[in-house]
Amino acid sequence: MSGTIPHFWAQPFRYIRWSAREKPAYFYSCVIAGLGPVFLTVVPPVRKYFGDVNPAPIPVTYPIPTGPRKQLTGYDDDTEEA
């Protein structure tokens, strides 16, 4: 184990190496978080290059049929006039 903990602003590369060994969860979570903005700019063109398209949106309403509706008979509906 090293003697003293390096300070980030004094020795940034030494601090990064130290944190990768001593606190890997924090180190790799910062690495993944730092790659987020890069992925936002790189991934969409790569998806488009490989032909991946977004799926059609899921319908949120029932489609209304076109044309007139059929009048039902024989189900005790003759009391209601449309």
Swiss-Prot record:
It is a single-pass membrane protein. It is found in: Mitochondrion inner membrane. Signal peptide: none annotated. The chain crosses the membrane at residues 25-43. Its main location: mitochondrion. GO terms for cellular component: mitochondrial inner membrane. Keywords: Electron transport, Membrane, Mitochondrion, Mitochondrion inner membrane, Respiratory chain, Transmembrane, Transmembrane helix, Transport. It comes from the Eukaryota. Complex I is composed of about 40 different subunits. Belongs to the complex I NDUFA3 subunit family. Accessory subunit of the mitochondrial membrane respiratory chain NADH dehydrogenase (Complex I), that is believed not to be involved in catalysis. Complex I functions in the transfer of electrons from NADH to the respiratory chain. The immediate electron acceptor for the enzyme is believed to be ubiquinone. This subunit binds ubiquinone. This is NADH-ubiquinone oxidoreductase 9.5 kDa subunit. It comes from Neurospora crassa (strain ATCC 24698 / 74-OR23-1A / CBS 708.71 / DSM 1257 / FGSC 987). The lineage of its organism: Eukaryota, Fungi, Dikarya, Ascomycota, Pezizomycotina. The gene is nuo9.5.
